[in-house]
Amino acid sequence: MSEDRTGHQGISGPATRAIHAGYRPDPATGAVNVPIYASSTFAQDGVGGLRGGFEYARTGNPTRAALEASLAAVEEGAFARAFSSGMAATDCALRAMLRPGDHVVIPDDAYGGTFRLIDKVFTRWDVQYTPVRLADLDAVGAAITPRTRLIWVETPTNPLLSIADITAIAELGTDRSAKVLVDNTFASPALQQPLRLGADVVLHSTTKYIGGHSDVVGGALVTNDEELDEEFAFLQNGAGAVPGPFDAYLTMRGLKTLVLRMQRHSENACAVAEFLADHPSVSSVLYPGLPSHPGHEIAARQMRGFGGMVSVRMRAGRRAAQDLCAKTRVFILAESLGGVESLIEHPSAMTHASTAGSQLEVPDDLVRLSVGIEDIADLLGDLEQALG
């Protein structure tokens, strides 16, 4: 979807955009929610006479189009494309923006799935990469080569919660003729809008906070660059990694409450981080909302809240990390994040196992918490009993 055709261009508030952008009440029925258009093909008024531009569901579907308009609106972008997963969106972005012989700069604590795709798949096609600590702008600049076409940013990163200065990296990318993509999954558009800070592309696993209920898998790319969007659209259609209409509906349903949920996620996560910071079993707490976090000032400047993700390192090492994961009752031991329920995991053995033995290897004493929107007393009580 390349524009908001719904008459909501004048809406400025993020919560209002999340609720209203992308769809207006149906003129025939008055339905206030977008219908689930469960059709694989669309009738034509004569050869080539498309109704609303729809011909085949892989190419376009009205429910998906409404979601794409909503996603563009909440990121304050001109164009958005929805995908069947965050990794499908990642794959599309890399194929659209890189060619054999090109080079990409990535975080030295990137998401394991992103690292695996670049390291195990794109290197087969002679795409080179350099992991670097994105908080160190001098290191980022030194990593850029004449073949660098893309700087891949996560902020906060998964799972070490590092913070990168989006504006500074975007300026560096402009100076060195490299595009800047920001994976905004951890912050969500409710807390951070990278396009406004100078990024060229924003990526989401909409499975996480945007969907928000652990019941749908999806991804998205948002940009103001029409040429890039055309390439994304070509690959979206050509490769076919698109969400079905029910997936698009569920994602759009979740998006409506995103701003409200992120407020509660952030409040709860801050309380959890402060509690864990004072616990003797914990050696360090990684949460950008803590003043002790090295990226706190940058996060406070470019985010409207610090999010719902907290990572901790256990003083007694790997066994203590695994024990904590095993003993919680409210926090559910599971991969993924961003749902209303609280989750706990051991990244080195779960989501980031693919980084083992690499520069991106995750410490085995690390526990990642996706702090949900439950009552904070129950969350703190659960962690207290699990820590003993």
Curated annotation (Swiss-Prot):
Cofactor: binding details: Binds 1 pyridoxal phosphate per subunit.
The keyword Amino-acid biosynthesis belongs to this UniProt entry's keyword annotation: yes
Region span, Disordered: 1-24
An example Gene Ontology CC term for this record: plasma membrane
Main location: cytoplasm
Keyword Amino-acid biosynthesis among UniProt keywords: yes
Modified residues (N6-(pyridoxal phosphate)lysine): K208
Name of protein: Cystathionine gamma-synthase
Organism: Mycobacterium tuberculosis (strain ATCC 25618 / H37Rv)
